[in-house]
């Protein structure tokens, strides 16, 4: 259903870093590029408009679907690191809070894709929580606190007491 190739990142012709994507059926990067998709996979999928980090659903939703994902080691994409781009400058912008809103949207749309709020989704949400916190780490303290409270509410709403992390490194996140 999805074929994912390897990629490299570069700042200039002299600064190139090749990603070492393992050839596995289970790993899919969150990037929308560097992949071939079967038409039916994206037939009803739409990137959320007006948000930064709109590619979050690729890993949050599509990776949770019962799809066959194959990776190949061939380099199929070159990603230029842009020091003025959203990824590099997001933490300085008020739009960085979009990372939370897209996460909330992903969880709201699970039923649209026939997905369940299971252990895999819970573990992903914990990892996404760290990503979101990193993206807003330069925002005012009140914004960071509000995002923390909203994230806590999401966890209670969708997972209540039915999931606990199996990842030792995520236990501190879970306790917070």
Where are these regions (language model features)?
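Amphipathic alpha-helical repeat scaffolds of TPR domains
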Residues: 120-135
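Secondary-structure edge/capping motif, primarily at the C-terminal ends of alpha-helices
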Residues: 110-114, 133-141
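Membrane-interface aromatic/basic loop that binds lipid-linked glycans or pyrophosphate carriers
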Residues: 138-176
């Amino acid at each position: 259903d999805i074929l994912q190739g390897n990629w490299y990142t570069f700042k200039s012709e002299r600064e190139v870093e090749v990603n070492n994507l393992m050839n596995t059926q289970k790993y899919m990067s969150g990037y929308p590029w560097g992949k071939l998709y079967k038409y039916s996979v994206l037939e009803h999928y739409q990137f959320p408009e007006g948000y930064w980090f709109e590619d979050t659903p690729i890993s949050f939703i599509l990776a949770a679907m019962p799809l066959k994902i194959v990776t190949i080691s061939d380099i199929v994409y070159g990603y230029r690191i842009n020091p003025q781009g959203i990824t590099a400058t997001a933490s300085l912008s008020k739009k960085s809070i979009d990372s939370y809103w897209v996460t909330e949207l992903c969880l709201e749309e699970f039923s649209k894709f026939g997905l369940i709020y299971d252990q895999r989704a819970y573990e992903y949400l914990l990892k996404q929580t760290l990503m979101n916190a990193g993206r807003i780490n330069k925002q005012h303290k009140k914004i960071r606190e509000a995002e923390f409270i909203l994230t806590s509410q999401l966890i209670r709403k969708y997972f209540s007491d039915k999931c606990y992390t199996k990842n030792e490194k995520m236990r501190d996140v879970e306790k917070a």
